[in-house]
Regions:
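Glycine-rich oxoanion-binding loops at beta->alpha junctions
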Residues: 9-36, 178-199, 207-208, 267-272
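Single conserved hydrophobic/aromatic residue that forms the stacking wall/gate
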Residues: 1-12, 293-296
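C-terminal non-catalytic interaction/assembly regions of soluble proteins
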Residues: 200, 206-292
């Protein structure tokens, strides 16, 4: 039996906009409950969280202990990871050692630094510039403590910065391996076989930006399609002009943003369905016109 945990459903809340205070504790409880229910494999999907605690909350929920410089035990949040002095893994629930835990994420960001958890994703969670720096220093300190606890530096492992550095926490505290979510999905549906006789592949996401280039759906599909010389059309809510050329190099044939008028997102989001339909209709008309010309 396999149990799945969807990160954004479990820990994301639009009402919680302070990543210094949010915690992954509940996710740890869910993982432990799944293990105790007798499952053999747990798949955790990371992304869309409101947290930045490096998985410390989840770890605490399964028995991992964190101590500050005074030797006092506490449960770190994003705002207190800088206070971690020592991590003790000896109390972790033994049943977790009997379960295979796989963690899927769609990005390859490291734990900290300019492309790490706090700098790239912190602003999406309500962090201003000063808070981003604070959170980043905390994750950097957590990385140091993890290295001391497990005897290995995992800070540069691709994906450790996912979901507020929970990727790192899943490796360090749960003995999990990280794998790209999109690759897992594509393998499951036999994508390479599916597109073998396709002329065009239409995919999309909310915004094509620097995060997209680090392994999300559009690029994951484009890289597979490129190996078979297939055309990939990305229909997106918006696109970062600075990243489009890179997307083309990675296998995307064309990018079509759906917004038809210069409107603020608060307005355009109410017209997403019709804008999407209008854009896809135009894409299909263009493809049909090309095919008719080829026949002539």
């Amino acid at each position: 039996e396999i149990r799945y945990s969807d990160w954004s459903s479990d820990v994301c809340s639009s009402d919680l906009k302070d990543p210094r205070k949010t915690t992954t504790y509940g996710v740890g409880q869910l993982i432990l409950a799944a293990a105790e229910s007798g499952v053999e494999k747990i798949i955790v999907g990371l992304g869309g969280s409101s947290t930045n605690d490096g998985g410390c909350g989840a770890a605490a929920a399964v028995g991992v202990k964190f101590y500050d410089k005074d030797g006092k035990e506490f449960v770190p949040t994003g705002g207190t990871t800088a206070d971690i002095c020592k991590i003790d893994l000896s109390g972790k629930a033994e049943i977790l050692n009997k379960v295979e835990i796989v963690t899927m994420c769609d990005i390859d960001n490291p734990m900290y630094g300019p492309t790490g958890a706090s700098h790239i994703f912190g602003p999406q969670k309500g962090a201003d510039e000063a808070m981003v720096l604070e959170l980043d220093e905390g994750i950097k300190n957590l990385s140091r403590a993890i290295t001391e606890a497990i005897g290995k530096d995992i800070s540069e492992v691709p994906g450790t910065g996912a979901a507020g550095a929970m990727g790192a926490g899943m490796i360090a505290f749960f003995g999990s391996r990280l794998q790209m979510g999109i690759q897992t999905v594509l393998d499951t549906v036999k994508f390479d076989e599916m597109i073998s006789d396709a002329d065009y592949i239409i995919t999309g996401e909310g915004k094509l930006d620097s995060q997209s280039l680090r392994g999300k759906v559009v690029i994951g599909i484009a890289e597979r399609a490129k190996k078979q010389n297939k055309n990939v059309i990305a229909v997106v809510g918006g696109a970062d002009d600075a990243e489009i050329d890179k997307a083309y190099e990675m296998g995307v044939t064309a990018v079509f943003p759906i917004n038809r008028l210069p409107q603020d997102f608060s307005i355009s989001r109410h017209h997403s369905k019709e804008n999407l339909a209008y854009t896809v209709d135009n894409v299909l008309r263009l493809i049909a016109a090309k095919d008719r010309k080829s026949v002539v």
